[in-house]
C-alpha cells in the first residue's frame, strides 16, 4: 500500500 500512504 503506497497509494494511500504516499503523502
Swiss-Prot record:
The modification (4R)-4,5-dihydroxyleucine is found at residue 3. GO terms for molecular function: toxin activity. The modification 2'-methylsulfonyltryptophan is found at residue 2. The modification D-serine (Cys) is found at residue 6. The modification D-threonine is found at residue 5. The 2'-methylsulfonyltryptophan is thought to arise from cross-linking to Cys-6, as found in other Amanita peptide toxins, followed by sulfur methylation, beta-elimination, and oxidation. The cysteine, converted to 2,3-didehydroalanine, is hydrated to D-serine. The keyword RNA-binding does not apply. Keywords: D-amino acid, Hydroxylation, Methylation, Toxin. The modification (3R,4R)-3,4-dihydroxyproline is found at residue 7. There is a cross-link at residues 1-7 (Cyclopeptide (Ala-Pro)). The modification 4,5,5'-trihydroxyleucine is found at residue 3. A toxin that binds to rabbit muscle actin with a dissociation constant of 20 nM preventing actin depolymerization, causing cellular and tissue disruption, and death. This is Virotoxin. It comes from Amanita virosa (European destroying angel).
